[in-house]
């Protein structure tokens, strides 16, 4: 491939044109054209692929326009955007701006009890990221299509609060944690420990407060609705219908959002969602509030269970660990998997749905960047890192000589891969 700058610019520009043309054609075919692009997972495959290619080509073109000085300028901008969004979340601006119509900066500042000039500065920076818009007479602010979605979806609100209240403060202690505990793998020697001045693991910290437990569970549910983490990728990564009416044990399944998605797509499967008792109590209530069809809810049950204890459900078709093991160091990950082994039936499988780190530059940068971001985020919270395929194979080999990773698949547009483990 020709790596000259002119050739790369030409290649990515052509990709932008081709992808945008296909997406535009799809939008014009719709009865009601949306104000924002639909999720990549909710459109025809060809359109979804075009959205992925458009994002990657635009990302690369943008970076070609930046010299080193502009790179530093953009990093400064990114930091201030994050700070502004955190400020807006903290003072509940997203919920105070009406979903329909507009409100004056003066009235909004009064209701939020913040200085009007600061409010205007924070909102106008957010506007450059398509959050909020000025509408009607001068001095009036309204939701943009994007900020309206963020404000009206409770799970996204929870995710935003979790980002503002937990992720951001933790990231600021990244350097301090490495300086204090270089090379440490202890669960209680992390940036999160420094940010919140506690001495247990992150999960100890969360479990000590029911409100934290609910906020974390809801934020994980929200993450699963984004296209990169959408549960539909899991639905397409294996022939679930081949399991018939088998039982899927959704370990650490939180609100049961993954099991619900699978139950809606595969009407014969049955599910046991396991998590800590406090999480289970809240999840049962949430499931009832959703008023899903009985054909779905009657196939899902919840069970209080700790990952580190022996698996009580015997002979299930699948033991699913989706975004679970990456939170644990190798020793505990091995222990969690070993707790499943005595429960395995002759045809049981263990599914790990997690990031498998690629070789640098081997996948689209827009996808790799999210993986690398999660890699560091994990370290800041739990002192773990995302794993390569070789890392996963090493863990499985420590669990049992009779277990093998038989299949690895990453659905296009997904950040997570599915690793299928079977007894040999």
Curated annotation (Swiss-Prot):
Keyword terms of this UniProt record: Methyltransferase, S-adenosyl-L-methionine, Transferase
Residues that coordinate or bind S-adenosyl-L-methionine: 275
Pfam families according to UniProt: Methyltransf_2
Functional summary from the UniProt entry: O-methyltransferase; part of the gene cluster that mediates the biosynthesis of aurasperone B, a dimeric gamma-naphthopyrone. The first step in the biosynthesis of aurasperone B is the production of gamma-naphthopyrone precursor YWA1 by the non-reducing polyketide synthase albA, via condensation of one acetyl-CoA starter unit with 6 malonyl-CoA units.
Active-site residue numbers: 326
The family this protein is said to belong to: Belongs to the class I-like SAM-binding methyltransferase superfamily. Cation-independent O-methyltransferase family.
Pathway the protein takes part in: Secondary metabolite biosynthesis
EC number, UniProt record: 2.1.1.-
GO molecular function, one term: O-methyltransferase activity
Name listed for the protein in its UniProt record: O-methyltransferase aunD
Annotated GO biological process: methylation; secondary metabolite biosynthetic process
Listed InterPro entries: COMT-like (IPR016461), O_MeTrfase_dom (IPR001077), SAM-dependent_MTases_sf (IPR029063), WH_DNA-bd_sf (IPR036390)
Organism name: Aspergillus niger (strain ATCC 1015 / CBS 113.46 / FGSC A1144 / LSHB Ac4 / NCTC 3858a / NRRL 328 / USDA 3528.7)
Phenotype upon gene inactivation: Leads to the accumulatio of aurasperone B and fonsecin B.
């Amino acid at each position: 491939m020709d790596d000259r700058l002119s050739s790369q610019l030409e290649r990515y520009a052509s990709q932008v044109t081709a992808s945008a043309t296909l997406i535009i054609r799809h939008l014009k075919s719709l009865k009601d054209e949306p104000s924002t692009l639909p999720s990549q997972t909710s459109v025809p495959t060809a359109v979804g692929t075009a959205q992925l290619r458009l994002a990657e080509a635009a990302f690369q073109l943008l970076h070609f326009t930046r010299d080193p000085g502009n790179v530093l300028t953009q990093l400064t901008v990114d930091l201030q955007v994050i700070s502004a969004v955190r400020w807006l979340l903290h003072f509940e601006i997203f919920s105070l701006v009406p979903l329909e119509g507009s409100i004056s900066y003066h009235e909004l500042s009064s209701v939020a009890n913040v200085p009007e000039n600061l409010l205007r500065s924070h909102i106008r920076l957010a506007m450059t990221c398509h959050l909020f818009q000025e509408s009607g007479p001068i001095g009036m602010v309204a939701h943009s299509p994007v900020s309206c979605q963020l404000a009206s979806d409770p799970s996204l609100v929870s995710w935003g609060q979790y980002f503002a209240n937990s992720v951001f403060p933790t990231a600021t202690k990244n350097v301090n944690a490495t300086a204090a505990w270089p090379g440490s793998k202890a669960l209680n020697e992390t940036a999160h420990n420094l940010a919140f001045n506690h001495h247990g693991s992150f999960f100890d910290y969360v479990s000590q407060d029911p409100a934290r437990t609910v906020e974390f569970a809801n934020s994980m549910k929200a993450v699963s609705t984004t296209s990169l983490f959408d549960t539909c990728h899991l639905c397409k990564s294996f022939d679930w219908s081949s399991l018939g009416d088998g039982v899927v044990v959704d370990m650490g399944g939180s609100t049961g959002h993954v099991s619900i998605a699978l139950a809606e797509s595969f009407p014969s499967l049955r599910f046991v969602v396991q998590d800590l008792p406090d999480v289970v109590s809240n999840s049962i209530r949430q499931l009832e509030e959703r008023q899903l069809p009985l054909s779905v809810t009657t196939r899902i049950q919840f069970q209080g269970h700790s990952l580190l204890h022996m698996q009580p459900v015997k002979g299930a078709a699948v033991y699913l660990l989706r975004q679970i093991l990456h939170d644990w160091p190798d020793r505990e990950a091995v222990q969690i998997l070993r707790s499943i082994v005595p429960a395995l039936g002759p045809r049981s499988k263990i599914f790990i749905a997690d990031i498998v780190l690629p070789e640098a530059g081997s996948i689209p940068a827009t996808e790799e960047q999210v993986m690398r971001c999660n890699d560091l985020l994990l370290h800041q919270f739990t002192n773990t890192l995302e794993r390569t395929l070789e890392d996963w194979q090493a863990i499985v080999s420590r669990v049992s000589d009779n277990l093998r990773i038989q299949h690895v698949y990453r659905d296009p547009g997904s950040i997570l891969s599915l690793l299928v483990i079977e007894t040999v």
